[in-house]
Amino acid sequence: MDNFFMTWLLPLFIVVGKTLLLLTVLLVLIAYLLYADRKIWAAVQLRRGPNVVGPWGLLQSFADLIKFVVKEPIIPSGANKGVFLLAPFVSATLALSAWAVVPVNEGWEIASINVGLLYILAISSLEVYGVIMGGWASNSKYPFLGALRSAAQMVSYEVSIGFVLVTVILVSGSLDLTTIVQEQNKGLGTYLGLPFSSLLDWNWLILFPMFIIFFISALAETNRPPFDLVEAESELVAGHMVEYSSTPYMLFFLGEYVAIVLMCALTTILFLGGWLPPLDVWWLNWVPGVIWFVLKVCFVFFWFAMVKAFVPRYRYDQLMRLGWKVFLPISLAMVVITAAILKYTSFA
């Protein structure tokens, strides 16, 4: 009995505990990032934004949650009921499951696997199926057009993201996310002999073109403006979510924001040193790594919000052209250049 407890039950309890803790923190973080998103957008437009529910409007996201849950879900008469209801669960579940391998500090992840980057790429590629299912099952032209756009958009930018990840793998020599962060302890700043140079050691500097490509591709991958063509209000009303209401709509919305925060976390891990402090000095090393990680995620999300506020939406043909004719050649060239530098110079 003791052997069964130590071999099976205890590890199971630990995994369940880690999962519940991560989900709780993640959902609370998303609630306040959504609040920040609305506040930033309001500030750019000289409005006040949410300011009624709770002090300074801090409880607005929780009020929205209650509103969505208590509303009546409406299913169109011509919809495929089973697929229609399954689609938002697929979208939200896949978005949440990608977080299983994300380390928010050294050793702080639910599952430590040596191909974590490949796992996240695979899961993020599957998320589009929830959108396609919802668009098709609604039996309406606007959701279906949104689903078709989502599929084409995902294919266009997934290739560029794949090449970006290849360059990071070449530089770090691993698919393990923890190793990728640890390898950023000895980057360009260390190579040049600069003291306290953690900020210059991170991959954003030596892979700057790929950093920009990844950031813009992440906007397209998560359907954020200026690439929100899947749910373009002026063209498709709300895209694949037109016929949804109540909890199913909330699950689509949740999956979208979980994917956005995942891309912010991935940007932090791949290019901004993960949980490493910006300067290698004792008083910054004293700060827990998870705090640095959350601050960097919030910094990346701030730029997601600013792009939404400032940049007008692309036309669909411009979006495709950017993915296939600009990002793909540049990312492919950077893979070749990075491999050549690592092979024929002493930088490796």
Curated annotation (Swiss-Prot):
Cellular compartments per GO CC: plasma membrane
Topology term for the membrane: Multi-pass membrane protein
What biological processes does GO assign it? aerobic respiration
UniProt GO molecular function: NADH dehydrogenase activity; oxidoreductase activity, acting on NAD(P)H, quinone or similar compound as acceptor; quinone binding
Give the residue spans that cross the bilayer.
Answer: 10-30, 82-102, 115-135, 161-181, 199-219, 251-271, 287-307, 322-342
Matching InterPro entries, A to Z?
A: NADH_UbQ_OxRdtase_su1/FPO, NADH_UbQ_OxRdtase_su1_CS
What EC numbers are recorded for this enzyme? Answer: 7.1.1.-
Q: Which domain of life is it from?
A: Bacteria
**Which Pfam family, any one of them, does this sequence belong to?**
NADHdh
**Which reaction equations make up its catalytic activity?**
a quinone + NADH + 5 H(+)(in) = a quinol + NAD(+) + 4 H(+)(out)
Tell whether Transmembrane is among the UniProt keywords: yes
Q: What NCBIfam families is this protein classified in?
A: PRK06076.1-2, PRK06076.1-6
- Give a short account of what the protein does: NDH-1 shuttles electrons from NADH, via FMN and iron-sulfur (Fe-S) centers, to quinones in the respiratory chain. The immediate electron acceptor for the enzyme in this species is believed to be ubiquinone. Couples the redox reaction to proton translocation (for every two electrons transferred, four hydrogen ions are translocated across the cytoplasmic membrane), and thus conserves the redox energy in a proton gradient. This subunit may bind ubiquinone.
Which family, according to UniProt?
Belongs to the complex I subunit 1 family.
On assembly, the entry states: NDH-1 is composed of 14 different subunits. Subunits NuoA, H, J, K, L, M, N constitute the membrane sector of the complex.
Report the HAMAP family cross-referenced here. Answer: NDH1_NuoH
State the name under which the record lists this protein. Answer: NADH-quinone oxidoreductase subunit H
What organism is listed for this UniProt entry?
Bartonella bacilliformis (strain ATCC 35685 / KC583 / Herrer 020/F12,63)
